[in-house]
């Protein structure tokens, strides 16, 4: 016979959501001292663990750098197609915020928190894209290097108050 009792964790989550006027996503930052130290790899490993727990995980944007380990981890995750923008005559992939909001996964991976978005983007900086995802109730995993922190102190403050 099925257990018809309510799950206390789900009840508590519903109460908190109602009290806050809606669920705000959680942010997890994979922090490193420089490029190539394994932030994206660690983020992808954590995403696989979340997927294994039944979380709806989508890759919003990953800077691939053609690393075989990164490519292998990407192969078993859903990857949203990037927006193609033209920069100095070249096609450049950009994170598709609109596509991510439309897809509305439980968890989205968006590499490079300190990235400056293309001119025709909704926001100037990727951290603003991430803030919008969080407000939409989507959990976000992202990466950042230490050299970007000093210049983004104000943004980090805004994100942790979201």
Placement of each model-derived feature along the sequence:
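Conserved nucleotide-binding/hydrolysis micro-motifs of P-loop NTPases
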Residues: 63-68, 114-115, 140, 146-151
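Extreme N-terminal, non-catalytic leader segments
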Residues: 1-30
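Conserved ATPase-coupling elements of RecA-like P-loop NTPase cores
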Residues: 112-127, 151-154
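Loop/turn-to-beta-strand initiation segments
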Residues: 56, 104-107, 133-142
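Conserved phosphate-handling catalytic cores of large alpha/beta enzymes
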Residues: 148-162
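Conserved P-loop
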Residues: 24-102
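Short gly/ser/thr-rich secondary-structure transition/capping motifs
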Residues: 11-14, 88-94, 159-162
């Amino acid at each position: 016979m099925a257990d018809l009792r309510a799950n206390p964790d789900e009840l508590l989550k519903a109460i908190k959501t109602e009290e806050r006027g809606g669920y705000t996503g959680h942010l997890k930052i994979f922090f490193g001292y420089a490029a190539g130290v394994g932030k994206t790899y660690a983020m992808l490993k954590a995403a696989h663990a979340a997927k294994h727990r039944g979380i709806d995980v989508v890759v919003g944007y990953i800077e691939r750098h053609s690393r075989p380990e990164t490519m292998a981890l990407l192969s078993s995750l859903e990857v949203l197609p990037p927006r193609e923008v033209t920069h100095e005559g070249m096609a450049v992939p950009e994170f598709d915020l609109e596509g991510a909001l439309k897809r509305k996964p439980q968890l989205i991976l968006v590499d490079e928190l300190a990235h400056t978005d293309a001119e025709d983007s909704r926001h100037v900086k990727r951290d603003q894209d991430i803030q919008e995802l969080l407000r939409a109730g989507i959990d976000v995993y992202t990466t950042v290097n230490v050299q970007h922190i000093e210049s983004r102190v104000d943004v980090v403050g805004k994100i942790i108050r979201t």
